């Protein structure tokens, strides 16, 4: 993991090196609510269990679930890495002084600690609260039925995904996107860029 983390000898505590970085002022929930305004949303519906019905109501489907499951794992199951989270509320104003701290120590079972209030940069009413919410992120082995978070980047899974990618290339009304649909690691900015590029291509 240390190969993915920036090492700095400055007071810059950013994880990324991008010139422009930000978080929606009212949070991601409010942003997504505005994006979905006027759009019918169905919660707790498994597309794969209702695909025939749902395919009838759309000219194009954007599928962001696991691509192998879309095809009933006809070539075999892709592997994933998973995570588990533990969240605690501490009666202190500041727990760690930063939004995210990554830990690469082999003796520590979690990989990062997230103190959520520090994402509210400059919002004194939040930062000065007398308690704080902290989440510990642990790596977890993945098995069927678990939440898949990351693709496994090795030769075996790469070759297996290529079979699914070639099969997906023959689809006329399905677009596969995201980490699971394209079976590749994507940061948020990469995901947004890919979605914008895909939308522009579809609207040409």
Q: Residue ranges of each PLM-predicted region?
A:
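Aromatic-acidic/polar surface patches that form glycan- and anion
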Residues: 21-28, 102-106, 184-191
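A broad, structural surface signal
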Residues: 30-33, 37, 72, 193-200, ...
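Short, flexible micro-motifs
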Residues: 30, 68, 181-184
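C-terminal catalytic lobe of FAD-dependent flavoproteins
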Residues: 147-204
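Short hydrophobic/aromatic-rich motifs at helix boundaries and adjacent loops
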Residues: 3-6, 132-136, 171
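Mid-domain catalytic core of redox enzymes
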Residues: 45-167
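Active-site/ligand-binding neighborhood in enzyme catalytic cores
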Residues: 1-60, 64, 71
């Amino acid at each position: 993991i240390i190969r993915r983390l920036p090492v700095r000898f400055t007071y810059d505590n950013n994880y990324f090196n991008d010139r422009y970085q930000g978080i929606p002022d009212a949070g991601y929930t409010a942003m997504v609510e505005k994006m979905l305004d006027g759009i019918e949303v169905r919660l707790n519906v498994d597309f794969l269990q209702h695909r025939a019905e749902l395919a009838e109501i759309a000219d194009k489907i954007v599928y962001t679930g696991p691509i192998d499951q879309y095809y009933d794992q006809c070539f075999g199951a892709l592997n994933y890495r998973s995570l588990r989270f533990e969240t605690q509320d501490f009666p202190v104003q500041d727990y760690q002084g930063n939004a995210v701290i990554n830990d690469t120590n082999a003796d520590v079972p979690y990989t990062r600690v997230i103190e959520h209030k520090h994402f509210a940069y400059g919002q004194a009413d939040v930062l000065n609260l007398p308690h704080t919410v902290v989440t510990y992120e642990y790596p977890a082995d993945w098995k069927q039925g678990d939440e898949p978070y990351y693709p496994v980047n090795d030769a075996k899974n790469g070759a297996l995904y290529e079979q699914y990618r070639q099969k997906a290339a023959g689809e006329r009304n399905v677009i596969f996107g995201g980490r699971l649909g394209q079976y590749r690691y994507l940061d948020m900015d990469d995901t947004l860029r890919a979605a914008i590029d895909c939308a522009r291509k579809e609207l040409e």
